[in-house]
Amino acid sequence: RDPNLLVGFDKSDDASVYKVSDDLALVQTVDFFPPIADDPYLFGQIAATNALSDVYAMGGEPKLCLNIMAVPESMPKEAVHQLLRGGYNKVYEAGALITGGHSILDDEPKYGLAVTGFVHPDRVLTNSGARPGDVLLLTKPIGIGVLTTAQKAEMLSAEGRALAEELMTTLNKSARDAMVKYRVHACTDVTGFGLLGHSYEMAQGSDVELELEVDAIDL
């Protein structure tokens, strides 16, 4: 194994990290998925926010992004434009750049980003550094997946939909910026596996036990 590969895929971390010099390491990740919103602009925002979060979870700052997109031939050009605009605006908000990308034809739209960020090699955060006595903090409420599932079944209220959209398009930049000011030992991005799944990965990777106070979890 290359000694400069600080984080690989052996412990299910959010991104890989490669040491370039004594004070610089690259953080790389890729994430894309089918639409979870009917509005293409909103979908672009959600997908970009999700991809950028993997770099934030490693303690890094995203800098360079590549679009990854699949679209049907029948998709209107304006919808494609709005999709890309949604992604671009979130990348711009993060202080990063879109420098290219790749697109293919597919029956179902898909969109996301390949993201490269920077972090100091001594300040990399992983999901396997938790220690006994640490306090587990959530930066967003959980349950967004439940809301999006309800939306697909047309069972979600307007208030619930607005809340889900706000949370899914809020960058974790401010959480990352606050986190790096303190002695945080471990971090992960809670997404598809939910709180329990990602807590299990953190506990297993860190060789510790996690105790969740259910009443304190923001839903």
Question: What residue ranges belong to the model's regions?
Answer:
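Helix-biased detector of long, well-ordered alpha-helical tracts
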Residues: 1-219
